[in-house]
From Swiss-Prot:
The gene is H2-Q10. Heterodimer of an alpha chain and a beta chain (beta-2-microglobulin). The chain crosses the membrane at residues 311-324. Disulfide bonds join 125-188, 227-283. Residues 299-310 are annotated as: Connecting peptide. It comes from the Eukaryota. One of its GO terms (biological process) is antigen processing and presentation of peptide antigen via MHC class I. This is H-2 class I histocompatibility antigen, Q10 alpha chain. Belongs to the MHC class I family. GO terms for cellular component: extracellular space; lumenal side of endoplasmic reticulum membrane; MHC class I protein complex; phagocytic vesicle membrane.
Length: 325
């Protein structure tokens, strides 16, 4: 996405960058389609991004010099010209449908054409380790708020407000749920399995986490122990702290899994403990790339390394600031 993309669009697409929560061995495909009106600046901008698991594999941007569906993963370059032409035409058709929907929603909400408005559509499917359908999902948002969603039964709709009820009634009369269910349970699964085969060297790999525990003295006689997991794939991982074998779920700080920028992920969990009691606490790491769960403790450095340890402590605030960017 270019640096000049509307802030609203950036916020709505940020969800796509968050790792999906999946069952071990399961895989998902998701598309995010977004249209943003910009009065006085021409037609609405329309963007599609497609993800297999946590990997972006296709993208369309109506603001591109030559708007086309394009590969965003090396393994997608195996698809031929017919595929890209078909997907480009589908994207352009959806773009026009979104333009109509933006005008329709202005009427539903009694809004003027002078303001900028946004529609986002997310849909996709998930399969288990055996390649069989697990679930499908499809939902719309308008101006950053839920609008209408297909329920998990893929037969009924949840409308978020009075305007969305109008849409729900129209779609119930048209049998839209049946149409979408047929796609999600069959065609979506077929394409997901195809993409998993094309990208199997990347998508089906398992990179075990590199782990360690760091030690950060506090100002009140306590210590923060932070358990790090770095460089792992896929994104699904569990970190827990235990005190003498009992989990400390309530007392633990746990950050969301973050992309590392190289196709792997990072995560940490921390707990505040009394000074001198560090050895009573253990970090436990669960990931499908590990032959068995890991158990870690903080290992105090030898006394001869105390100076280097102090220098390392001084450097941690820079790393912490980087992590929260």
């Amino acid at each position: 996405m270019g640096a000049m993309a509307p802030r609203t669009l950036l916020l709505l697409l940020a969800a796509a960058l968050a790792p999906t929560q999946t069952q071990a061995g399961s895989h998902s495909m998701r598309y995010f389609e977004t249209s943003v009106s910009r009065p006085g600046l021409g037609e609405p901008r329309f963007i599609i991004v497609g993800y297999v698991d946590d990997t972006q594999f296709v993208r369309f941007d109506s603001d591109a010099e030559t708007p086309r569906m394009e590969p965003r993963a090396p393994w997608m370059e195996q698809e031929g010209p017919e595929y890209w032409e078909r997907e480009t035409q589908r994207a352009k058709g959806n773009e026009q449908s979104f333009h109509v929907s933006l005008r329709t929603l202005l009427g539903y909400y009694n809004q003027s054409e002078s303001g900028s408005h946004t529609i986002q559509w997310m849909y996709g499917c998930k399969v288990g380790s055996d390649g069989r359908f697990l679930r499908g999902y499809l939902q719309y948002a308008y101006d950053g708020r839920d609008y209408i969603a297909l329920n998990e039964d893929l037969k009924t709709w949840t409308a978020a407000d009075v305007a969305a009820i109008i849409t729900r009634r129209k779609w119930e009369q048209a049998g839209a749920a049946e149409y979408y269910r047929a796609y999600l349970e069959a065609e979506c699964v077929e394409w997901l399995l195809r993409y998993l085969e094309l990208g199997k060297e990347t998508l089906l790999r398992t990179d075990p986490p590199k782990t360690h525990v760091t030690h950060h003295p506090g100002s009140e006689g306590d210590v923060t122990l932070r358990c790090w997991a770095l460089g792992f794939y896929p994104a699904d991982i569990t970190l827990t702290w235990q005190l003498n074998g009992e989990e400390l779920t309530q007392d633990m700080e746990l950050v969301e899994t973050r992309p590392a920028g190289d196709g792997t992920f990072q995560k940490w969990a921390s707990v505040v403990v009394p000074l001198g009691k560090e050895q009573n606490y253990t970090c436990h790491v669960y990931h499908e790339g590990l032959p068995e769960p890991l158990t870690l403790r903080w290992e105090p450095p030898p006394s001869t390394d105390s100076i280097m340890s102090h220098i390392a402590d001084l450097l941690w605030p820079s790393l912490k600031l980087w992590w929260y960017l």
